Amino acid sequence: MNSGGSDSFDYLLQLTKALSAECRANRQETDRIELLLKRLAKQSGISYDNLSKNIIPDSWKDNASQKASPPTEAQKLISENFKLIYEIEKQEYFNTKAVALINNINEHFSYIKNFIDEQNAIRERNIATFSSEKLDERNKSLQQNYESLKTENEETKKKLHSIIKQFEKLLKEVDWDRISKDSRDYSRFKKQLEYLQDTYQVLK
C-alpha cells in the first residue's frame, strides 16, 4: 500500500471512529429522553403510549407485533464496520496496556541491574581493602618475629619456618582475580612482597 492509500485509510478510520462515537452518544440521548417520558407519564397518570403518541416517532417505539425486516446490504456493511471498529479500539486498548506493562517491567529490571552493579562494586572495594589490611598485619608480624628470632637456636628457626608457611598459605587463599591490579592497595602490597623476598629471601 502506497503512502497516499495509507493516509486515506487512516483518515477513513478516524472518521468512522468519530461517527461511531456520535451514533453511540445519540442513542444514549434517545434512551435518556424515552426514560424521562416514561417517568413523566407515570407521575401524571397518563398512558405512556398516549403521551408519546404525538412526541416520539413510531420508529423509536418498541412494537413486538411488528416483524423486523431483513437487513439490507448497506445495513450489513455498516454492522460489520461497527464490529471492526470495536475490535480495533479493543486491540488499541490492550496494546496500550501491554506497552505500559513492558515499560514498567523494563524499569524494574533496570533498577535491579543498577542495584546489583552497585553492590558488586562495593563488595570488590571491601575485599581489596580487607585483604590489604590483613596482609599488612601479617607482614608486620613476620618482620617483628624475624628480628626477635634470627639470633636464637634451631627451635627458633622452626618457628620462623612455620610463620613463613602460614604466610604462604595466606597468599594462596587470597582470590587475586577479584582484586583490581590497578588499585593503590595492590601496588603497595606487591612492593612489600618484593621487599620481603629481596631482603630476607623468605618466599620461594
Swiss-Prot record:
Present with 1540 molecules/cell in log phase SD medium. The gene is FAR3. Participates in the control of the reentry into the cell cycle following pheromone treatment. It is found in: Endoplasmic reticulum. Keywords: Cell cycle, Endoplasmic reticulum. Component of a complex at least composed of FAR3, FAR7, FAR8, FAR10, FAR11 and VPS64. The keyword Zinc does not apply. GO terms for cellular component: cell periphery; endoplasmic reticulum; endoplasmic reticulum membrane; FAR/SIN/STRIPAK complex; Golgi cis cisterna. The keyword Endoplasmic reticulum applies. GO terms for biological process: cellular response to pheromone; re-entry into mitotic cell cycle after pheromone arrest; regulation of cell cycle. This is Factor arrest protein 3.
